[in-house]
A protein has these predicted regions:
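Catalytic and ligand-binding motifs that coordinate phosphates/metal ions
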Residues: 61, 65
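Acidic/polar-rich alpha-helix caps and helix-coil junctions
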Residues: 1-27, 59, 69-220
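Short, cationic low-complexity segments
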Residues: 34-52, 85-87
Length: 220
């Protein structure tokens, strides 16, 4: 499990910010930022509904989102679990799933809000693979090495061996848009997608795809 505390500094990590509970620092705020108030977070960010629905099923989706929202309170100086212990996302406080990457390493013992001490990824190996594939596609030189880089990400996302070809997920062609879309799924909730949408001038396209049931208004 990539997002566990144990894998915070695995071979996947290229550059990351380190935290230590033993050193008494303030910790990683991403668990609170991506958790709803009812889960003892701040509801700062959560996935747009159509993005969640379009996200390919599989191991990566299961790791990226929380669909049963924890129902917690704060009593006696500690975070407690209420009854029921969780609520299905569509009837939850925010009517959305939560991002789940940072909740895998959350610490509920420090204070009234969930916090974490897992290293925060700035760049990781899968992003390097996708940057390479996109650069090759953008330069008109998409080749076997670029497709292999993309397919390694797609295989792992499906819970397969990333280094073994698999016709069920491998692609034989890919455009820049295909790769940027894959990057959006791979790095969901990691604060990268906005920059890719702006860079590729596809922000308006993403907005146009918003689910009509989306309850979060856009500020214009």
């Amino acid at each position: 499990q990539l997002w566990s505390m144990e894998n915070a500094n695995s071979k996947e990590s290229i550059l990351s910010a380190q935290y230590s509970k033993d050193e008494g620092n303030t910790g990683n705020q991403m668990p609170a930022a991506t958790s709803f108030h009812m889960a003892r977070g701040w509801s700062d960010m959560y996935p747009e509904l159509q993005f969640f629905k379009d996200f390919p099923e599989g191991a990566r989706k299961e790791a990226s989102f929380v669909t049963d929202i924890p129902n917690r309170g704060f009593s006696g100086g500690k975070i407690i679990t209420k009854t029921p212990s969780s609520v299905e996302w569509s009837v939850s406080q925010r009517f959305h799933p939560m991002y789940g990457k940072w909740t895998k390493s959350e610490d509920l013992t420090v204070g009234p809000r969930t916090i974490g001490f897992r290293a925060q990824e700035v760049y990781r190996y899968s992003e390097v693979l996708l940057i390479y594939a996109e650069a090759k596609a953008a330069s008109g030189s998409m080749d076997a090495s670029a497709l292999e880089a993309l397919n390694q990400v797609k295989r792992r996302a499906a819970g397969l061996d990333p280094n073994t070809a698999d016709a069920s997920v491998d692609v034989t062609t890919a455009t820049v848009n295909d790769i940027v879309t894959e990057k959006g799924w791979e790095l969901a909730g990691e604060n990268k997608r906005w920059f890719d949408l702006i860079r590729t001038e596809t922000l308006e396209d993403a907005i146009a795809k918003r689910d009509p049931n989306e309850q979060v208004p856009l500020v214009r």
